[in-house]
Amino acid sequence: MAVLMLSALTFSACGDDEDGGNGSQSGQVDKKNKNANVPSAANGYNKAIQRREFPALKQGGKQKVLVYRMKSTAYDKDGVNFSVEWDCNKRSQRWTCYQMHRGYSGKYSRVSNFYFDTTNLTADEYYDEFNYFPGYDRGHICPSGDRTASEEMNAQTFVMTNMQPQYHQFNGYDDSGNSGLWVRMENQLRKWADKLSVTDTIFVCKGGTIDSEANIITRINGKLIVPKYFYMAILRKSSFGYAGMAFWSDQTKSWRMNETLHSHAISISELEKRTGIDFFCNLPDDVEAQVEKTFNSSVWSGL
């Protein structure tokens, strides 16, 4: 297995806006971006939280942001593969965020086994007995299929902090040609990424609902949360500017082949209301407001 390069941080404030985490360390609030994440003493001045794909970090409680980095900078100038917000009290992943562009496609697929992040989490911050979810698949939030350009990046997607329990009928296939609604959403996102020009990028934040009892199906053995809903916040940057949309679906134990992706597509603003998460907070406020309030299905082929 490839050696992992990991970093962890725990808090966030507000600040400057950068695509790749090279923003200011001053901690000053950009007047054009009042809700952005800001590197500070509390989070070790970690610049990764200023990347475009990041949402606003949750305040209160005990959270850790785990930034999974590659040794190579061939695919990302800062070596970032994907990042996770981990709730240490709930012992659950809140979201995974990452970038997609043409450079992430290659020949490597499912090169690793599942493993725990014992480097960044202490024994009381995760349930180590749940290496397998009885009755559920281990659902990658950053999929293995989105990281096929190198063995190292693919192997990192198998860390258990990047997993949520998902029904096989929601995130799998069968021999009769059925495919889960969630996996169809992921496949569509991958198709959009495959059509990007060499200078275009898709920014993604995905996860399941863990913050409200009404949005939880159950707890495995009374412990591990099974989210009732799953979502994707999607931001595309191209020569035409920014476009945004989101997917939202309840998790059920049925194939739902008659349901279209369009019926689960919403604006990012609506997704924020449903999740309580401020997505793409590192965009300038005027750009963020425009792309989040509008969902134009005509610019998203395949819906």
PLM regions and their residue ranges:
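Domain-level detector for secreted/extracellular nuclease and nuclease-toxin modules, and
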Residues: C14-L303
